[in-house]
């Protein structure tokens, strides 16, 4: 019997277009200014150091070329690390340091009123109904936990964070590795077979299924992946109830 619903965000509860066309460009545009403004902040400096360590260990040829260029040129630390972070954004690398910095930039954007998050039309209705039926709701996204909470706090329909009991990001583990899902079930203190995971990524569904979770593939218009392979697809979150009986 399913008791917990673990939800991806982008392409599952929120259109991919909001993330790709609004959130990512906003963080990309404001990255260098944010780092310059907060360079004295210990947490921000720690994230910059983490990104530097990641860069030096990065085996990707283009990342290595970028690092060699940084050592040759007389650029500032901020300019150099920004070039690497912009590179990670371009190649869609799931870097925890980058995700944390993006979350901090988005927080400022939300608080200034520059950003309001748009969810799928049925998302809030479905989440409320699940909550009313005593399902425990949790989030697992590649975006940082702070970014996840910001997205749900600043929706066009108000604050929805109270709907969720657990939040997980890539610091828990890679979303494409089955161990991450086992660890999540342990963190929620629930047998893995009692969890339903919903995502628009086949690789993530594969990993969750391997761990023992039930899975549904979010097949929405505009999502990058349109082939569910052997996973059960749903085109609307309301369809989720058909698989909880």
Swiss-Prot record:
InterPro entries assigned: Enolase-ppase_E1, HAD-like_sf, HAD_sf
Keyword Magnesium: yes
Known EC number: 3.1.3.77
One example GO MF annotation: acireductone synthase activity
Subunit structure and binding partners: Monomer.
Signal sequence residues: none
Pathway given in the UniProt record: Amino-acid biosynthesis; L-methionine biosynthesis via salvage pathway; L-methionine from S-methyl-5-thio-alpha-D-ribose 1-phosphate: step 3/6; Amino-acid biosynthesis; L-methionine biosynthesis via salvage pathway; L-methionine from S-methyl-5-thio-alpha-D-ribose 1-phosphate: step 4/6
Gene: mtnC
Cofactor requirements of the protein: Mg(2+)
Keyword Amino-acid biosynthesis part of the UniProt annotation: yes
One GO process term, biological-process aspect: L-methionine salvage from methylthioadenosine
UniProt cofactor note: Binds 1 Mg(2+) ion per subunit.
Family: Belongs to the HAD-like hydrolase superfamily. MasA/MtnC family.
Function: Bifunctional enzyme that catalyzes the enolization of 2,3-diketo-5-methylthiopentyl-1-phosphate (DK-MTP-1-P) into the intermediate 2-hydroxy-3-keto-5-methylthiopentenyl-1-phosphate (HK-MTPenyl-1-P), which is then dephosphorylated to form the acireductone 1,2-dihydroxy-3-keto-5-methylthiopentene (DHK-MTPene).
Protein name: Enolase-phosphatase E1
Swiss-Prot/TrEMBL keywords: Amino-acid biosynthesis, Hydrolase, Magnesium, Metal-binding, Methionine biosynthesis
Recorded catalytic activity of this chain's protein: 5-methylsulfanyl-2,3-dioxopentyl phosphate + H2O = 1,2-dihydroxy-5-(methylsulfanyl)pent-1-en-3-one + phosphate
